[in-house]
């Protein structure tokens, strides 16, 4: 499993609008993507910093989304986002929710 961690800085007083845009426009796009598994988003107490983590079956699925659909997502969010979102990618090491764990290396 693979994860995309997107850090977003919102314009002032736009958290509620971001939530609406995410639910009505972005989530439907994500659900259509091959390999998409889950999305979890966090908002800071200041209401302008958001972290969105999406989980994907494979790195290739996440990269395909990043190339083909993510530019559209950035455009959709442009009215509520201040600056350019920062994207980091990771291999999922462990998830109790998805019952995933990294293989334990065998020592000879």
Located regions from the model:
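Short S/T/G/P-rich N-terminal loop/turn motif that feeds into the first structured element of a domain
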Residues: 1-51, 55-71, 78-108
């Amino acid at each position: 499993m693979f994860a995309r961690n997107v850090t977003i800085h919102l314009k002032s007083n736009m958290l509620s609008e971001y939530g609406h845009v995410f639910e009505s426009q972005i989530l439907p796009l994500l659900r259509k993507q091959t390999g998409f598994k889950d999305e979890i988003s966090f908002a800071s107490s200041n209401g302008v910093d958001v972290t969105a983590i999406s989980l994907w079956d494979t790195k290739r699925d996440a990269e395909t989304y990043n190339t083909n659909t993510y530019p559209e997502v950035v455009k959709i969010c442009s009215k509520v986002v201040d600056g350019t979102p920062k994207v980091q990618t990771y291999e999922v090491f462990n998830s109790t929710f998805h019952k995933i764990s990294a293989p334990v290396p065998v020592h000879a």
